[in-house]
Amino acid sequence: MLAPGAPDHHNPFMEPITLSTERLLLRPFGPQDAEDTHAACQDPGIRRWTVVPSPYTRADAELFTGKLSPQGWADDTMYNFAVVLRESGALVGAVGVNSRVLTGTYEVGFWTAREHRGRGYTTEAVREAARWSFTDLAADRLEWRAEVGNVPSRAVALKAGFRMEGDQRSALFNKGTRRDVWIGALIPADLGLAGTHPYLPAPGVSATP
């Protein structure tokens, strides 16, 4: 029997879900988020370090919130959450969990609206999304990647418990060029959770941080 919200691979539709933390709600994006998403993505930092289009138009925001994000849930490949404040509903940012080629491996990505940075919101959201990935998606490995030099993203990943694993050359294609990336990963044991398959660390490699 599947845990509540876990994907049924005989029926690949993943029912959208809302996650909650002490200060935040992580809920699926919808058309109502287009205006705030468009405003947030005018920030040069988001356009520089993420793969969002630049310039970022209202049509881009409508496509992301109204079509691409819902479709990701429907085809069980991409789970984008709007991160909002519990008290006011204000959009703090986005956290997305995407499936990778290797079974049980997913990748997390995120951005934070400029006015909400420096308060720990994104770290809080990433931790919750990671826990959900392990318990509901049956993930055995959650990867984080960012272009080399994206220090704020790296700081969030480290605070969320990711272990840095090194650099990858030419591993990101962004705005017409290939870029080098930093890579880190989180596994269920890092959060005190059991994985879906046994994990045998290599000699000299600790299973947990």
Regions found by a protein language model. Name each.
Residues 1-47, 80-209:
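Acyl-donor (CoA/ACP) binding surface of acyl/acetyltransferases
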Residues 68-82:
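A short helix-loop-beta-strand connector motif used in the catalytic cores of GNAT acetyltransferases and
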Residues 30, 39, 54-58, 76:
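Generic structural signal for well-ordered secondary structure
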Residues 41, 50, 72-73:
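Hydrophobic residues in alpha-helical segments
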Residues 67-68, 176:
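Generic detector of ordered secondary-structure context
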Residues 47-67:
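Conserved GNAT-fold acetyl-CoA-binding loop/helix
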